[in-house]
Structures are given as C-alpha cells and as structure tokens.
Amino acid sequence: MKYIGAHVSAAGGLANAAIRAAEIDATAFALFTKNQRQWRAAPLTTQTIDKFKAACEKYHYTSAQILPHDSYLINLGHPVAEALEKSRDAFIDEMQRCEQLGLSLLNFHPGSHLMQISEEDCLARIAESINIALDKTQGVTAVIENSAGQGSNLGFKFEHLAAIIDGVEDKSRVGVCIDTCHAFAAGYDLRTPAECEKTFADFARIVGFKYLRGMHLNDAKSTFGSRVDRHHSLGEGNIGHDAFRWIMQDDRFDGIPLILETINPDIWAEEIAWLKAQQTEKAVA
C-alpha cells in the first residue's frame, strides 16, 4: 500500500498538521516539529503531545505514515568543532521531540563540508553524529535525505549515503529518503521508465531498498545534472509524469511516506489524487 501526502504546515499547533493532511485526502504527511529556521524551541507540552496523538488517531495516521523533517540549520558534518556540537545537540533535541510525539522517523539533510574538510572526513562526522543521537534516543530512525549537491552539500551520490550508513553502528535505526528532484539534479535520470529502472537498480546495488524509509516526490525546475535544487509541480518540470507513474506502480515503494514538496500547495489534493489513480491503473491493467 502506498502512503501518499505532502509536507504540511503545523502553524497553530502540531495537531493541525494531521488535520491539514486529512483535508487534502493524504495518507501520509511530513511536518516540522519546531520552527525549522531557529535553533531553539520551547519544550513540547503534555497538551501539545496529547493533541497531536489524538489528531493522528482521529485521521488514522500511524508513525509509519509520518515523515518529520529537522531544522535546515543543522549540519551534522560541520568542519568546526563548536558548530558541529551545536548541530549535534539540536539534532538530538529533534530526535527526542519525535520520540515524545510517538514518531518513528526523522528526515534530515546529511551535511556540508564547507570546503574546509574532505568529503570522506565530512561523511565520517555525519555517521558519528548519527551514532551519538541514536545512543541518546530510542525508537526513532535517522532518515538521510539525498541532496542535489548544491555548494558543498554531501549526499548527492548514492555512495555518500552508503558510506554514512556503513559508519552507523545500529543499522536498524538508519535509513534514507530519496528526493526525486535532488536525484535528477545530481545526475540520476528519471525521465523514462527505463531510466527509472537503471537509477533504482543503482540504488539497490549501492544502498539497498531495505534502507528506503521515505521519498520526496518532486518534479524539477532545475536541469538534469545541474546540481541545483529547484522543485516543480508534478509533470510540469524537467522530470515529467512518467517517473511518478512508475513509482506508483512499483511495490518496492509501498509502506513508506511518499511526500510532495511541490511548489503549489493549492494543487496538492489534485496531485495526491493523480498519484493514487496511477496506482489504481496498475490494479486494473
């Protein structure tokens, strides 16, 4: 079964994220559990936690259908010790918030070397950061998102994701989220079913589908291999509809949150309905 949704706003209270997801007929959703552009956040209150859990129960969202995202400020591969420590503390807080909310996944951008250390050293720092966070939390899986490779951001090669996973001690609590726009911008072609087969065969060989814990379904304004991260609505960008139809008809993508981060929230309900219809097409065929 496919879990299909979008990254919805939690403005006005975390429970509102579940309500907004239900309003667009989503069977999955993503959210920030705190302001993503600030380091600090007030601790979660018992009331906030209870309201969120009640809303998820009311609208039938389990933790397997929810993919929280951490703060954009966090860099788990930071080359400067003091800044790395700050990022690690913030990441642990994000993991603990998920734990309190009964959420089992936390999606994050791996990190950037800022042209100050090697890729290898940065990847090792990211893995070490994950190990520290896993040691201080329970029940939450660290879900590494592939990047488009802008600037000095790592994670744009499947080999980067594999190297991080290799350095994580508890393999049962690490996974990956593949963003289609990021993959395309990083040089993994998705424009035809044949290219999708090739790209995900590479993914299976280098990383492994057992680590796939979520996806971001985004078309791309950016061009193929450009290393530029610019999302677009499904079918309106340089990837096109075929990739998303292909994903919907492949059962390797079942049972994980498939999250839209496309640029027009006004048509998320339409995009979700279209994705669901592609899945139905296969059942009818």
Swiss-Prot record:
InterPro entries: AP_endonuc_2 (IPR001719), AP_endonuc_F2_Zn_BS (IPR018246), Xyl_isomerase-like_sf (IPR036237), Xyl_isomerase-like_TIM-brl (IPR013022). PROSITE patterns: AP_NUCLEASE_F2_1, AP_NUCLEASE_F2_2, AP_NUCLEASE_F2_3, AP_NUCLEASE_F2_4. Keywords: DNA damage, DNA repair, Endonuclease, Hydrolase, Metal-binding, Nuclease, Zinc. Zn(2+) 3 binds at H182, D229, H231. It comes from the Bacteria. Zn(2+) 1 binds at H69, H109, E145. It is an enzyme of class 3 (hydrolase). It catalyses: Endonucleolytic cleavage to 5'-phosphooligonucleotide end-products. CDD domains: AP2Ec. One of its GO terms (biological process) is base-excision repair. Its cofactor is Zn(2+). Its EC number is 3.1.21.2. HAMAP family: Nfo. Belongs to the AP endonuclease 2 family. This is Probable endonuclease 4. The gene is nfo.
